[in-house]
Design a protein with these regions (language model features):
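Structured loop/turn residues at secondary-structure junctions
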Residues: 14, 66-67
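FMN-binding flavodoxin-like domain, especially the glycine-rich phosphate-binding loop
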Residues: 3-4, 21, 33-37, 59, ...
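A short beta-strand-loop structural module common to alpha/beta enzyme folds
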Residues: 33-51
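Short, charge-patterned binding micro-sites
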Residues: 51-52, 63-64
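N-terminal beta1-alpha1 ligand-phosphate binding loop
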Residues: 2-36
Length: 183
């Protein structure tokens, strides 16, 4: 079997757009990575709210913004509703949300262990997010002010691209490796 024809769905839940921008960057990098180009890999980024069916894809990258230590409800619902299809293909998870230097909070979201088990994912990465007051609602702005949360874009595109490169290499390697017991 060759790596040609690999299709990857990158789907994410985003409240203010930063996590969806990460999903778009991951999809783009999967396609443009050295392994992705060599194998003809294609990836698409679809907001999780569109409930994309994973069955037409070789692999899935599922992500969510994190608020109050948890994934957004739409991402949790997608994982639960699509668990059967997700478990039949390679899946990777990512979270976006910590802010500042160093990123805070440093811990993984509370529900990641359950998401890993539910989806059978190969792994999970936490990426720093973006916090801009202009994109927040009144209640969110009040909370940010009270917490003295640092404002800014803390996303590290080099780390995001490197992770996508690793996923592409793993996918291409898995589809081009000879079967066990065959010459």
């Amino acid at each position: 079997m060759t790596g040609y024809g690999l299709r990857v769905l990158v789907t994410a839940a985003s409240r203010h757009g930063a996590t969806q921008e990460i999903a778009v960057a991951i999809a783009s990098r999967l396609t443009e990575s050295p392994a992705g180009r060599a194998a003809g890999l294609t990836a698409v980024a679809v907001p999780v709210g569109q409930d994309a069916d994973p069955s037409g894809f070789t692999a899935v990258v599922l992500g969510s913004a994190v608020y109050a230590g948890r994934w957004l409800e739409s991402a949790r619902t997608y994982a639960a509703t699509r668990a059967g299809g997700l478990r039949q293909r390679p899946v990777w998870l990512f979270s976006s949300g910590p802010i500042g230097e160093p990123p805070f909070p440093p811990d993984e979201p509370h529900d990641v262990a359950a998401m890993l088990q539910l989806t059978g994912a190969h792994g999970h990465r936490v990426f720093p997010g973006r916090l801009e007051k202009a994109r927040l609602g009144f209640g969110e702005r009040a909370m940010v002010t009270a917490m003295r949360a640092p404002l800014g874009d803390f996303r590290n595109w080099t780390d995001i691209n490197a992770w996508a490169d690793d996923i592409a290499a793993e996918l291409v390697g898995a589809t081009t490796a000879p079967a066990v017991g065959r010459p």
